Amino acid sequence: MRLNTLSPAEGAKHAPKRVGRGIGSGLGKTAGRGHKGQNSRSGGGVRRGFEGGQMPLYRRLPKFGFTSRKAMITAEVRLSELALVEGDVIDLNTLKAANVVGVQIEFAKVMLSGEIARPVTLRGLRVTKGARAAIEAAGGKIEE
């Protein structure tokens, strides 16, 4: 068996519709688009959210909220992700080096999700109560 002899099983693939190829094909002449109208034209159709000229839903509803600038530079880190980081001392730079958080991140908070078996020292990271208990139970410690 070689790569050039492989083929999908019989009946596993459907042939694509061939439209506009004569009356006998069942999809000739208008090619399944019907007669006239905007959708029969090439490039026809309306944009997403268009409701025929009626004020669309996304404009009928009021604007609300905002995007926190701090949320863009803050990351949540799971305990299971901490287990993947090499070394005993973990800080923001070691998380970035291990590709756990992106380079633009300035703050990280450790969440209780997954588990950690080895003792680690967290330096300069925020930690939830549950994650703190799990880290200390594994013999680790948290430095502010």
From Swiss-Prot:
Record protein name field: Large ribosomal subunit protein uL15
One matching Pfam family: Ribosomal_L27A
Quaternary structure annotation from Swiss-Prot or TrEMBL: Part of the 50S ribosomal subunit.
GO cellular component, one term: cytosolic large ribosomal subunit
Gene behind this protein: rplO
Alphabetical GO biological process terms: translation
Role of this protein: Binds to the 23S rRNA.
Superkingdom as given in the UniProt entry: Bacteria
PANTHER family cross-referenced by the UniProt entry: 50S RIBOSOMAL PROTEIN L15, LARGE RIBOSOMAL SUBUNIT PROTEIN UL15M
Biased composition (Gly residues): 21-31
Membership in a protein family: Belongs to the universal ribosomal protein uL15 family.
Keywords for the protein's UniProt record, in alphabetical order: Ribonucleoprotein, Ribosomal protein, RNA-binding, rRNA-binding
Species lineage: Bacteria, Pseudomonadati, Pseudomonadota, Gammaproteobacteria, Enterobacterales
SS bond list: none
Native organism: Serratia proteamaculans (strain 568)
InterPro entries linked: Ribosomal_uL15, Ribosomal_uL15/eL18, Ribosomal_uL15/eL18_sf, Ribosomal_uL15_bac-type, Ribosomal_uL15_CS
Ranges for region Disordered: 1-53
GO molecular function, one term: structural constituent of ribosome
UniProt xrefs under SUPFAM superfamilies: Ribosomal proteins L15p and L18e
